[in-house]
Structures are given as structure tokens and as C-alpha cells.
A protein has these predicted regions:
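Outer-membrane beta-barrel initiation region
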Residues: 1-78, 156-178, 194-196, 295
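C-terminal outer-membrane beta-barrel translocator/porin domains of Gram-negative envelope proteins
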Residues: 9-11, 157-322, 357
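Flexible, solvent-exposed coil segments and beta strand-coil junctions
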Residues: 13-14, 39-46, 85-95, 135-152, ...
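Transmembrane beta-strands of outer-membrane beta-barrel proteins
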Residues: 16-20, 49-55, 71-76, 122-132, ...
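Transmembrane beta-strands of outer-membrane beta-barrel pores
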Residues: 22-28, 57-61, 70, 77-83, ...
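Residues that define the transmembrane beta-barrel architecture of outer-membrane proteins
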Residues: 31-38, 56-60, 101-109, 154-160, ...
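Outer-membrane beta-barrel translocator/channel fold
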Residues: 69, 74-124, 136-148, 239, ...
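Outer-membrane beta-barrel "beta-signal"
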Residues: 335-344, 360-373
């Protein structure tokens, strides 16, 4: 528009941000019409250490890495401790007898190496880490739990994880992917100390040990013949649990959150055509392709289409949770905008063909407000 704007630089090595928002579902997912969410994000990068923390109370992810040159000692903690009944859905109907409450807490520590890579911004590095893991799993009946549902015992968890990351991505003003790729993988082995007390039944596998592998690729780039304001964006995710070892308690959680941008958030599997919620899957492969247009220097519009193959949790008989293959698709129209008080807004409208509601298509809307301190 012929005017110049001076935007003060952001110290991306020292960031504190608050995200609050919510989603509305149409139709409902089971009995769920919508839900709020919020999280505090902290990132600090010093010469000899770094930390990255996402805190929401019931679900948290904390990491602190001590570095000496390219070597680092990695410490990591995560928990998923939702104090509400968790039920499976069939044809968008909650199967009440499957109701349980359960959660997991996991701590990890181990060595790693990290090297900076082009374009040498704070996110850009290649790292390989080997972590020992110790944690705890708990599960409890609710007033609605079927008498025949086998509930696993509370148990100690321990194992190891191999984690590799590469991030060569350049981000734009709103931290959205602009140019480059990021990729990585995880190989995770866990032993459930008391799982031999089970005999299969409604929980699936009776084996104590399981191996899971995941991988991802996220990218953004220009479109030949169009301006710098036009971007093509894509992401691909895959995950597999060792054969016969999947159950609802160790299944992957496929999320429908916004298109990934922040470096450590890239690895979390998402089906971008879906709304902001988790779906249990024993194995999955998903790909999303989109177009993003910079409407003004602070406003971006994205159009994204998604495809998903997955072995989704469903119910057999009255209360037996099993996994069945599904192939689904979805689409999202999203707007990212700068806002007052050093903040940004995210608004998205999504539709998908039945993975979220296990047999019934539908859509919804998500709104986020992100405040940078």
C-alpha cells in the first residue's frame, strides 16, 4: 500500500507466550460440543543450556538440555493426566461401558549431540539423542465402566528412546514455515512392569513390552511464477506399534491442531483436516498439502487438504477396544493474523470425513489467541 512499517525484532532465543482458545464441533464428537484450551510456552537458549516448556496443567512437556560444545545432556518430562472419563466412540456415539480414567507420567535423561545448520536461526539444528526413560501408568474404573472390562494395574514404566531431528526451516513474522524442510524420527521402547497380570481381554495385548516408531517431514517453499507471498506447505507423519502390542493405553494420539511451525512441535502427529482433539490409533500415515497467501504483511490465509490412513480405536462387542483400519480425508481454511499487544490470532474452519467421530463426517471451528510477553 506504499507505506513502510518498522517492526521491532523478537528475541526468539528468549520467548514466553500464552495461548488460549477453544474449539466448537458440528456435529458433536460423541457428547462433546466444544472445549477450551490454554498453555504457557517458554523457550530459553543460553550459551551452555536451553529449555523448552509447554505447561497446561493436565498435559505438560518440559525439557532442559545442558550443553558443552556439540555435546548435551538431555532431561525431559511429560505427563498426560486428564482427570475425566475417557470413552471410545462408534458412529459418533460414546460407548459408555468403555469408560475409564488413566494417565501417564514419563521422565527421560540421556546424552545427545547437536549441530547448528543453515539458515542458522535459533530453531535450526541437527540433533541425535539417546534417552533412558522411567515413568508411571495408572488406570481406574468409573461409575460407568463395564464389569467385564479388564482394567490394567498401576505400574512402573521404563525403557529407552532414540530421537533424531533436523530443522532447516526459515519462519516468517508469525513463526509460520516459510522456506525449507524439517524432518526427524523417534524409536521408543517401553516395558510395563506389571502388564503380565493381564490376560488380554478388553485391553488388547497382554505383552509387557512394546516398540513404537514415528517419523515426520514438514516443508514450505515458493511457487514458480508467483510472488514471495505465495507459499506451498506440506507435512507427512507416520507411526507404527510393534505387531500385536497396541492397546488404548499406549496408542498414538492423532491431533487436529494448527499446521505445525514451532521446531519441537513439528514432531507431534496431526491430521490437519480435523479439529483440535486427540484420536487413539495404533498405526497411522497422514499427509497434508496446502497453499498459503500473505494477504497483508500481518495476515495470512491457508487452504490445506489432508489424507489419513490409520488403525483407529473402536469397540467390538460391549466393551472390547480394538483397532480397525480407516481411510479418511479432510480440509481446512485458516487465517493467521498479527494483533494488538504483541499477540496473534488463529481462526480455522475444518471438515473431515469420519476419523474424528469414527464413522460420521463433520466439521468445526478453532480460535486461538497467542500473547508474546
Amino acid at each position: 500500500m506504499g507505506e513502510r512499517f518498522k517492526i521491532p525484532p523478537v528475541d526468539r532465543a528468549h520467548m514466553t507466550a500464552l495461548t488460549v482458545g477453544g474449539s466448537l464441533l458440528a456435529p458433536k464428537q460423541g457428547d462433546l460440543r466444544g472445549f477450551p484450551f490454554g498453555a504457557l510456552y517458554v523457550r530459553r537458549v543460553w550459551n551452555d543450556a536451553r529449555t523448552r516448556d509447554v505447561v497446561s496443567g493436565l498435559v505438560n512437556e518440559l525439557e532442559y538440555d545442558k550443553t558443552v560444545g556439540p555435546l548435551e545432556l538431555v532431561t525431559h518430562f511429560e505427563n498426560y493426566t486428564i482427570p475425566f472419563d475417557q470413552r471410545e466412540i462408534v458412529d459418533n456415539v460414546e460407548i459408555v461401558p468403555t469408560s475409564l480414567q488413566w494417565g501417564t507420567l514419563l521422565g527421560s535423561i540421556g546424552p545427545g549431540v547437536r549441530f547448528p545448520v543453515h539458515p542458522f536461526q535459533v530453531d535450526n539444528d541437527i540433533r541425535v539423542q539417546l534417552l533412558g526413560r522411567v515413568g508411571y501408568f495408572y488406570a481406574d474404573r468409573t461409575s460407568d465402566t463395564s464389569p467385564g472390562l479388564v482394567v490394567p494395574p498401576d505400574t512402573v514404566l521404563y525403557g529407552a528412546k532414540l530421537r533424531a531431528r533436523y530443522d532447516g526451516m526459515r519462519r516468517n513474522l508469525l513463526e509460520l514455515p516459510h522456506q525449507g524442510i524439517a524432518t526427524g524420527f523417534d524409536v521408543d521402547y517401553l516395558h510395563r512392569d506389571k502388564w503380565s497380570d493381564l490376560n488380554g481381554g478388553s485391553t488388547g495385548s497382554a505383552r509387557r513390552n512394546y516398540l513404537q516408531g514415528t517419523a515426520y517431514l514438514v516443508g514450505a517453499g515458493g511457487i514458480p511464477g508467483l510472488s514471495e507471498r505465495d507459499r506451498v506447505i506440506f507435512c507427512m507423519y507416520g507411526g507404527k506399534t510393534s505387531e500385536g502390542d497396541a492397546d488404548r493405553f499406549n496408542a498414538f494420539r492423532i491431533n487436529g491442531s494448527p499446521f505445525p511451525g514451532e521446531a519441537d512441535d513439528l514432531a507431534h502427529p496431526r491430521y490437519t483436516g480435523a479439529i483440535h482433539n486427540d484420536v487413539l490409533s495404533s498405526s497411522y500415515a497422514t499427509a497434508s498439502l496446502g497453499y498459503r497467501r500473505e494477504l497483508t504483511f500481518f495476515l495470512y490465509m491457508s487452504l490445506v487438504g489432508s489424507y489419513l490412513w490409520g488403525e483407529r480405536a473402536t469397540v467390538q462387542g460391549v466393551d472390547q477396544v480394538v483397532f480397525r483400519q480407516q481411510r479418511r480425508g479432510g480440509a481446512t481454511v485458516a487465517f493467521d493474523s498479527g494483533f494488538l499487544w504483541n499477540s496473534s490470532l488463529y481462526l480455522a474452519f475444518s471438515w473431515e470425513s469420519g476419523y474424528l467421530r469414527n464413522g460420521k463426517d463433520g466439521g468445526g471451528a478453532t480460535f486461538n489467541w497467542n500473547k508474546l510477553f
